[in-house]
Regions:
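Bacterial Sec-dependent N-terminal signal peptides
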Residues: 1-24, 438, 523
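A conserved alpha-helical element in kinase catalytic cores
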Residues: 123-143
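Middle-to-C-terminal accessory/interaction subdomains
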Residues: 24-29, 33-36, 46, 55, ...
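Internal "kinase-insert"/substrate-recognition segments embedded within catalytic cores
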Residues: 97-107, 121-122, 141-146, 158-267, ...
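Short beta-strand/loop motifs in extracellular/secreted proteins, especially
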Residues: 61-63, 96-98, 149, 466-470
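Conserved oxyanion/phosphate-binding beta-strand-loop segments in alpha/beta enzyme cores
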Residues: 63-121
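Short, well-structured beta-strand/strand-turn elements
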Residues: 141-152, 272
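C-terminal outer-membrane/trafficking sorting elements
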Residues: 18-21, 441-450, 454-523
Length: 523
């Protein structure tokens, strides 16, 4: 079985080699797992009433901030603070999720290059670490996710609670994670409360107003052009099966997306595109002209969000422990078309098996859980505004916890028991030894090129082959075309602008096996 390494891992290595002193913005907060101390001082009387009054309008309030991390203590006057969240706002105490904007009132104010921080209140999570563990595993497996950590938060000298700190997806994130921040960044709409505007990637027409309730542009707002996203949805929904299969890798970073989908499925994280069709970002990388997928909001991972309704223990819907690898809600065309393609679904299973072998298992995840538990235990005990008891916190590390009805009620899966049960089911459903590995697929066979001679377009077809490098050279040996396709067995190349003459096609696969063919262009 293969082991893939995300580009980010290589990027971090080369950055470290070329400049050992270089730091990524936000390292002080996120590089090492730690518990920050956040002390906010509001000068308004009845400040929390004002925060609640501003919730629906997302209006900030001024507060002074003292932030302590592993590198020291830092003071910031007049940061912006506002409450946030959808279901998390139903937390029965005043421990609401919130956001800090360093730059809201003091232009240019940042902490270690970071302009905004999000604070999740661990709603519906007795373990107090679901989101952190989920993001840790996703990041290690090569998927784009925000960085996260923990914090003890004080409002006007009073301990308000223990929170999970989550990085903002903005141009700072794009700078370090993707190395490109010129493109359009879209956030999937909330679709909260059954508004019937899911960010489902269904094509509703060519007019931007058809999508403004579904996707929010977060960069290049002055230009406010959604054409690129609409074009992508047009491609997903209206391409022929053959064109979708052959061109998807040209449209998005497919390897990372397939891994992202696999992780949502394994963790039964269905408050995502797979289920609710929200809680994700899409970024159009201008350096590669490909879309990149970024996860968001993992607080209901480990099966806390029902799959198709009622998916918890004893629920009437799908049992989230026994969800098949190709599960998705209806009207999710990107997933539907991927799973309908033999080659793309095979590519998905390759990524799925790699993650199952190397990341989604008790041997890998249990030590992460134990480490976080030992770090946060005393802080969780000190949080008098948490939804659950200290015993619930201790027990939910390994066992299910049940509570009453209402927001956050019901049965919440234990972290370790969920992983163990889910892995046991998946290993019975997928025989990863039967999934052809990269090594078995290296050899290109039955290469076809037609028509020959050609005038406007050539079609290439082949069998097998992974890690392909396709080059076309003219009669003088000048490179006129190069591509590195993944997970496909055919490719169309437009040649209508090429000069008439003889050309040489060279196919090289990852094991060094090469095949070549000569063709001509006549008009």
């Amino acid at each position: 079985m293969k082991t893939r390494k995300h580009t980010l891992a290589l990027m971090a290595f080369f950055i470290g080699v070329t400049n050992v002193f270089a730091q990524i913005e936000g390292d002080k907060i996120f590089k090492n797992t730690q518990i920050l101390t956040i002390e906010l001082t509001f000068h308004q009387t009845s400040f929390f009433d004002s925060l609640e009054a501003n919730y629906l309008t997302a209006e900030y309030m001024k507060a002074d901030l003292v932030l302590t991390d592993s590198t020291g203590t830092y003071s910031y006057p007049e940061v912006g603070v506002r409450l946030k969240g959808n279901s998390t706002y139903n937390h029965p105490n005043n421990k609401k999720a919130f956001k800090i904007d360093f730059n809201e009132y003091v232009s240019g104010q940042k902490h270690d290059g970071i302009k905004k921080l999000n604070f999740s209140n661990n709603f519906k999570d007795p373990s107090m670490m679901r989101e952190k563990v989920f993001f840790d595993v996703c990041k290690a497996a090569g998927v784009l996710v925000p960085r996260s950590n923990f914090a003890n938060v004080y409002f006007n000298g009073t301990l308000w609670g223990f929170y999970t700190v989550v990085e903002q997806i903005d141009d700072q994130f794009l700078d370090w994670a993707i190395l490109d921040d010129d493109g359009n960044l879209f956030k999937a709409g909330d679709n909260f409360g059954g508004s019937n505007t899911p960010a489902d990637l269904v094509y509703y027409g060519s007019t931007a107003s058809d999508y403004t309730d579904r996707y929010e542009l977060k960069t290049n707002e002055d230009v406010n052009d959604m054409t690129d996203l609409i074009d992508f949805m047009d491609f997903v929904n209206n391409s022929t099966s053959a064109n979708f299969e052959s061109q998807l890798f040209n449209k998005m970073e497919l390897n990372e997306y397939l891994r992202s989908v696999a992780l949502d499925n394994m963790f039964s994280n269905f408050d995502s595109y797979t289920g609710s069709a929200r809680n994700y970002y899409m970024y159009h990388n201008m350096s590669t002209d490909k879309w990149e997928w970024v996860k968001w909001d993992g607080n209901e991972a480990f099966g806390s969000y029902p799959a198709g309704g009622g998916g918890g223990p004893g629920g009437g819907g799908n049992n989230v422990l026994t969800i098949d690898p190709d599960y998705h809600d209806a009207d999710r065309p990107l997933l539907e078309n991927i799973f309908a393609s033999t080659s793309l679904y095979h590519a998905y299973l390759l990524e799925y098996c790699d993650i199952l072998e190397n990341y989604f298992n008790s041997s890998y995840i249990d030590p992460i859980i134990d480490s976080h538990y030992n770090l946060i235990k005393s802080s969780v005990y000190a949080d008098n505004n948490k939804m659950y008891t200290d015993a619930d916190f201790d027990n939910n590390i390994s066992s299910n916890v049940s509570s009453g009805s209402g927001p956050g009620g019901g049965t919440i899966y234990g972290l370790k028991s969920f992983i163990s049960s889910r892995v046991s089911y998946l290993e019975g459903e997928i025989d990863c030894d039967d999934i052809v590995s990269v090594e078995d697929m290296d050899k290109v066979e039955n290469l076809e090129l037609f028509p020959n001679p050609a005038s406007e377009q050539i079609t290439l077809k082949w069998e097998n082959g992974v890690g392909l490098d396709i080059k076309i050279l003219d009669s003088k040996g000048v490179l006129v075309y190069q591509n590195n396709p993944e997970y496909i067995n055919s490719l169309n190349v437009d040649v209508d602008s090429w000069a008439t003459g003889i050309y040489h096609l060279v196919f090289t696969s990852s094991n060094g096996t090469a095949k070549s063919q000569t063709f001509s262009i006549l008009r």
